[in-house]
Amino acid sequence: MRFYIKTFGCQMNENDSETMAGLLMKEGFTPASAPEEADVVIINTCAVRRKSEEKAYSELGQMLKIKRKRKLVVGVAGCVAEKEREKLLERGADFVLGTRAVLKVTEAVKRALQGEKVALFEDHLDEYTHELPRIRSSKHHAWVTIIFGCDRFCTYCIVPYTRGREKSRPMEDILEEVRELAKQGYREVTFLGQNVDAYGKDLKDGSSLAKLLEEASKIEGIERIWFLTSYPTDFSDELIEVIARNPKVAKSVHLPVQSGSNRILKLMNRSYTKEEYLALLERIRSKVPDVAISSDIIVGFPTETEEDFMETIDLVEKAQFERLNLAIYSPRKGTVAWKHYKDEVPYEEKVRRMQFLMNLQKRINRKLNERYKGKTVRVIVEAQAKNGLFYGRDIRNKIIAFEGEEWMIGRFADVKIEKITAGPLYGKVVWIEETPSPVSTDK
């Protein structure tokens, strides 16, 4: 029997899909390269925005078209599954897996193959350990989920309702997973969490993200460690110190701000002000001068005025982000904002505001990227792009493209930057690691 998993959304969904694939292969299922070749299709969904939910339903519709022509089991997992539950069975799905029930994927598939309609939502995260089989999408970089859920309850966000409350994995279990990855030749890991900075608070044993980064950096063979996604008020001075002094910890911080207006931040239930956020950036940069800080912003939140938007523009100009993810506000059913705030900003105005910020960020990117011209940076070669060039990222998460060969993938390379754009940088390889082995990760 062959299976195919289509994944939408965040890196945690990607990690969940890797785990589901590993569990299915352990039971004798084999992966298919396309849904047309599969006996079982699983759609791992995202519900963070209306558009992502619509993509999930569109994909379900496409799979049901195939199902009408031949025998096919179709399952839905992820945040849309958790949110819509049994409604998806009514829409034609054969099984539904909640976000904390992905470890029961083989049970769901086997029961569905017998003709049963299956909906599993029970929390099985206590069974989530380093011993789980996983089919990783990369041979040198691995996602490692360290904390599930979120306790922040931002008024626009569906995640606390679909992913549940915060639940940290024991530190030793995470470290054992990283040790196994190192033995398998993995060189980079990214620690994942909806609020990764909250790691360890619920364990009550002194565990923290800062301590985890320090311990993981001692594991031989692991050269770079990343973490996603941070919440400003949970970003500790201890964490800043670790980033500053530990050469294996990436000099890259993703720190969503969402708005520059204090009034809007309060309506969003973000527990900081614009001034406090900018002060945090200053603290980070004072200790880590070469850090690359990226962020997320929502435009068109209910009641956002032109004055509020100007405050956001001011924040972006002062923050000088290396990257900025922009989203138009879309109400998510069940959230506080959906219940209590009228979505009254015209769509055309939301688009105008987003376009303005996109253009502003492009100018900032271009200016910041000029610093790279003529410099030589160290990257891990990741893959070949559609244009034929290869690419990698430096320790600040800057994408560098260059001419290369397939054997280079997974190795360190020094690239001299020759061309600057507002996006990727382009350069020439001046050194390539002969065989993958522990080397300095920064340059």
UniProtKB/Swiss-Prot annotation:
<keyword id="KW-0411">Iron-sulfur</keyword>
<feature type="binding site">
    <location>
        <position position="150"/>
    </location>
    <ligand>
        <name>[4Fe-4S] cluster 2</name>
    </ligand>
</feature>
<feature type="binding site">
    <location>
        <position position="46"/>
    </location>
    <ligand>
        <name>[4Fe-4S] cluster 1</name>
    </ligand>
</feature>
<dbReference type="Pfam" id="PF01938">
    <property type="entry name" value="TRAM"/>
</dbReference>
<keyword id="KW-0949">S-adenosyl-L-methionine</keyword>
<feature type="domain" description="TRAM">
    <location>
        <begin position="370"/>
        <end position="431"/>
    </location>
</feature>
<comment type="subunit">
    <text>Monomer.</text>
</comment>
<dbReference type="InterPro" id="IPR005839">
    <property type="entry name" value="Methylthiotransferase"/>
</dbReference>
<keyword id="KW-0408">Iron</keyword>
<keyword id="KW-0963">Cytoplasm</keyword>
<feature type="binding site">
    <location>
        <position position="79"/>
    </location>
    <ligand>
        <name>[4Fe-4S] cluster 1</name>
    </ligand>
</feature>
<dbReference type="GO" id="GO:0035597">
    <property type="term" value="F:N6-isopentenyladenosine methylthiotransferase activity"/>
</dbReference>
<dbReference type="InterPro" id="IPR006463">
    <property type="entry name" value="MiaB_methiolase"/>
</dbReference>
<dbReference type="InterPro" id="IPR023404">
    <property type="entry name" value="rSAM_horseshoe"/>
</dbReference>
<dbReference type="InterPro" id="IPR007197">
    <property type="entry name" value="rSAM"/>
</dbReference>
<dbReference type="Pfam" id="PF04055">
    <property type="entry name" value="Radical_SAM"/>
</dbReference>
<keyword id="KW-0808">Transferase</keyword>
<dbReference type="Pfam" id="PF00919">
    <property type="entry name" value="UPF0004"/>
</dbReference>
<dbReference type="InterPro" id="IPR013848">
    <property type="entry name" value="Methylthiotransferase_N"/>
</dbReference>
<dbReference type="InterPro" id="IPR020612">
    <property type="entry name" value="Methylthiotransferase_CS"/>
</dbReference>
<keyword id="KW-0479">Metal-binding</keyword>
<keyword id="KW-0819">tRNA processing</keyword>
<dbReference type="InterPro" id="IPR038135">
    <property type="entry name" value="Methylthiotransferase_N_sf"/>
</dbReference>
<feature type="domain" description="MTTase N-terminal">
    <location>
        <begin position="1"/>
        <end position="114"/>
    </location>
</feature>
<comment type="similarity">
    <text>Belongs to the methylthiotransferase family. MiaB subfamily.</text>
</comment>
<dbReference type="InterPro" id="IPR002792">
    <property type="entry name" value="TRAM_dom"/>
</dbReference>
<comment type="function">
    <text>Catalyzes the methylthiolation of N6-(dimethylallyl)adenosine (i(6)A), leading to the formation of 2-methylthio-N6-(dimethylallyl)adenosine (ms(2)i(6)A) at position 37 in tRNAs that read codons beginning with uridine.</text>
</comment>
<dbReference type="GO" id="GO:0051539">
    <property type="term" value="F:4 iron, 4 sulfur cluster binding"/>
</dbReference>
<feature type="domain" description="Radical SAM core">
    <location>
        <begin position="136"/>
        <end position="367"/>
    </location>
</feature>
<dbReference type="GO" id="GO:0046872">
    <property type="term" value="F:metal ion binding"/>
</dbReference>
<keyword id="KW-0004">4Fe-4S</keyword>
<protein>
    <recommendedName>
        <fullName>tRNA-2-methylthio-N(6)-dimethylallyladenosine synthase</fullName>
        <ecNumber>2.8.4.3</ecNumber>
    </recommendedName>
</protein>
<dbReference type="InterPro" id="IPR006638">
    <property type="entry name" value="Elp3/MiaA/NifB-like_rSAM"/>
</dbReference>
<feature type="binding site">
    <location>
        <position position="154"/>
    </location>
    <ligand>
        <name>[4Fe-4S] cluster 2</name>
    </ligand>
</feature>
<dbReference type="GO" id="GO:0005829">
    <property type="term" value="C:cytosol"/>
</dbReference>
<feature type="binding site">
    <location>
        <position position="157"/>
    </location>
    <ligand>
        <name>[4Fe-4S] cluster 2</name>
    </ligand>
</feature>
<feature type="binding site">
    <location>
        <position position="10"/>
    </location>
    <ligand>
        <name>[4Fe-4S] cluster 1</name>
    </ligand>
</feature>
